[in-house]
Design a protein with these regions (language model features):
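Short, glycine-biased loop/turn motifs at secondary-structure junctions and
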Residues: 1-203, 207-399
Length: 399
């Protein structure tokens, strides 16, 4: 498979992993049944849907008999309305290991044997790593952490039963690439010798060579999981009940893929469950409401250093230095060095620089550069921004 084709597979799964369109419920339910059959299990008696992972986790806690979890009337009503008795024990035991863990491990072992260590590493780098980083690391992990905090301590065990659905995009992309079309030996060292056939997607691939056939059969056993991942969000597989969730209705990220929104949840589900984040860092909802009317006194009194940094970034470093009474450390031909100390964090240190080239209206623009806290001179700070030592910095023209 060419680099371009691998990129296309990765892009397809990245789009699925970040999708906010309504779930394709029929396709997802077909995927669930196929995943159970592929694991040698009968399909679940009930497939039920919830608007968010939080609601689904509460349903899982109720149906698995965690007696210490207080009954949730809303969850019970939704279960009843979908024909599933809201009774402890209805779900049966978790079948996650059979449906997800074992098939994944078997497929990985067979594909790794087919491609060899170098081929597997190259495949993962070309097709799985980017989707894994953008979807799992930057969306699923913070969402799971937040979800855990929203559940009572005694109910958090149900998160161990969850399958990522769309958030499994990273590793599904790599397996899908194996099924989609074999790569030439030049790209994956052991690929060409082992695979002589070609296949379709991970839902329907078939190989003509013995090595390729083995790999494709392993990937085919993931077809049900892939079907759910293309069509829905997180889900919980139990012997008698499968609990599925809708995808989020909103997902906001910054330019490098981190969850980020200044005035709304960075991830929001239809029932209101969501996660607020600033440049990848989860933040409390009440902070989002306060950001637009912050004062420098509030920032100074914030005891959480990480939240204080979020507040500073939104408030503006220049404004904060001016309003909070920063200490003027010194001035030289490169600018003015300012510093403001905190009791429990490194000092905020910045250089005020005046552009030597006037604007068209004759004014000179002022820039603020954040520099390391141990900076001693404005020249040293400006030099640091260019990756130079102070003695090496000799500007001829400033632009």
């Amino acid at each position: 498979m060419t680099a371009e084709a691998l990129g296309a597979v990765s892009a397809k799964w990245l789009a699925a992993g970040l999708s906010t369109v309504p779930a394709d419920r029929a396709a997802a339910e077909d995927g669930v049944r196929l995943a159970y059959r592929s694991a040698g299990l009968r399909p679940p008696k009930h497939i039920v849907w919830f608007a968010s992972p939080l609601a689904a986790a509460r349903a899982a806690a109720l149906l698995t008999g965690l007696s210490t979890v207080a009954p949730d009337g809303g969850v019970a009503f939704q279960l009843s309305s979908q024909g599933c008795p809201p009774v402890a024990g209805t779900a049966g035991p978790s079948v996650r290991a059979a449906v997800r863990t074992k098939p994944w491990a078997a497929a990985r072992a067979e594909v790794h044997a087919l491609l060899g260590p170098d081929g597997w590493a190259a495949l993962w780098s070309a097709c799985g790593a980017d989707a894994w980083r953008m979807v799992n690391d930057r969306v699923a992990v913070p969402l799971r952490t937040h979800l855990r905090s929203e559940l009572p301590a005694h109910a958090r065990a149900v998160l161990l039963d969850a399958v990522g659905g769309q958030h499994d995009a990273g590793w599904l992309a790599a397996f899908d690439a194996v099924a989609d079309a074999p790569a030439p030996a030049a790209e994956f060292p052991d690929y060409g010798a082992a695979v002589t056939g070609s296949g379709g997607s991970s839902g329907s691939g078939s190989g003509s060579g013995s090595g390729g056939g083995a790999a494709l059969l392993a990937v085919q056993r993931l077809a049900g999981l892939a079907g759910v991942a293309r069509a829905a969000g997180w889900w919980w597989p139990y012997a008698d009940v499968a609990i599925l969730t809708e995808r989020p209705v909103e997902l906001h990220r910054d330019n490098i893929g981190r969850l980020h929104a200044a005035d709304a949840p960075a991830v929001r589900f239809r029932d209101g469950f969501g996660l607020h984040a600033w440049r990848g860092m989860p933040i409390p909802p009440d902070l989002v409401r306060r950001l637009s009317r912050l004062t420098h006194q509030e920032i100074a009194s914030e005891r959480n250093a990480e939240l204080r940094r979020v507040m500073l970034e939104h408030f503006g470093y220049e404004r904060y230095l001016r309003e909070a009474g920063a200490h003027r450390v010194g001035e030289d031909e490169c600018g003015v060095l300012w510093q403001l100390r905190f009791a429990d964090d490194e000092p905020l240190t910045m250089v005020e620089v005046v552009n030597s080239t006037p604007e068209p209206d004759g004014t000179s623009r002022v820039y603020w550069l954040r520099v390391p806290p141990d900076t001693r001179t404005a020249r040293g700070g400006v030099a640091w921004t260019f990756g130079l030592a102070e003695a090496e910095y000799r500007p001829l023209v400033e632009t």
